[in-house]
Design a protein with these regions (language model features):
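Amphipathic alpha-helical packing segments from all-alpha helical-bundle domains
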Residues: 74, 79, 83, 119-145, ...
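Short, basic, alpha-helical segments at the C-terminal edge of helix-turn-helix-like DNA-binding modules
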Residues: 63-69
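Hydrophobic alpha-helical segments that form the core
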Residues: 103, 108, 153-172, 185-192
């Protein structure tokens, strides 16, 4: 019996991984269907059958990204809030500059370039970023409760500060900043913590590659 006309068999997870990388490298608007199908090794009918459309494919790709590239949650679980915040920043710097993957954070990069008129996409991306911000806020709250920070610390403002630093690190990495430079930014950010806590942390100099 002829096989002509039957949909091409493919591994959905592998195809989704490839799509995630295209979106990560190119962004949402810039990633064409031709680029996506070529990277995924499928044709357009197969893409539509398996994922619906480009927007739904992107939603699945960002969900995969968050499952596989989530360095924030384990970092914030460190024994102290200060150690958790610092690990969150440094671990993400290392991920943003990993030569094996595109630079920066997929969600931050696409959110920054997302046109305001695409309200559904913008809402989805900002919701993901707010989730990270809320995790940071909760960890800072625990730090205040544990006496790491003064009781009158403006937790909301401090959380927004570290969230801004985290997103800025992604943008800087995306535009070519070195790992070494970004770790120095983290050094500065943690001095803000120390100025609030009144207890400067003394650590041995770290050897970091550029």
């Amino acid at each position: 019996m002829s096989q002509r006309g039957r949909p091409r068999a493919f591994d959905r997870d592998t195809a989704l991984q490839a799509a995630m990388r295209v979106f990560w490298e190119r962004g949402y608007e810039q990633a064409s269907l031709s680029e996506l199908t070529a990277a995924m090794g499928i044709n357009r009918p197969s893409l539509y059958a398996a994922f619906g459309d480009k927007a739904q494919l992107f939603r699945e790709a960002t969900a995969l990204y968050q499952r596989t590239m989530n360095f924030t949650t384990p970092a914030l679980a460190r024994p102290t809030a200060r150690a958790g915040i610092e690990a969150m920043l440094r671990d993400n710097v290392d991920a943003y500059c990993d030569p094996a993957t595109p630079r920066g954070c997929l969600v931050v990069s696409v959110a920054a370039a997302c046109p305001d008129e695409d309200s559904e996409m913008k809402t989805m991306l900002t919701s993901k970023l707010r989730t990270v911000g809320e995790s940071v806020r909760q960890r800072l709250k625990q730090g205040v409760e544990a006496g790491e920070l003064p009781a009158d610390t403006d937790i909301g403002a401090l959380a927004a500060y570290f969230e801004t630093v985290l997103q800025g690190l992604s943008i800087q990495a995306r535009t070519g900043a070195s790992r070494q430079r970004l770790h120095r930014v983290v050094d500065c950010a943690m001095r803000v913590w120390d100025s609030l806590s009144g207890e400067p942390q003394k650590r041995p100099a770290r050897q970091r590659s550029a």
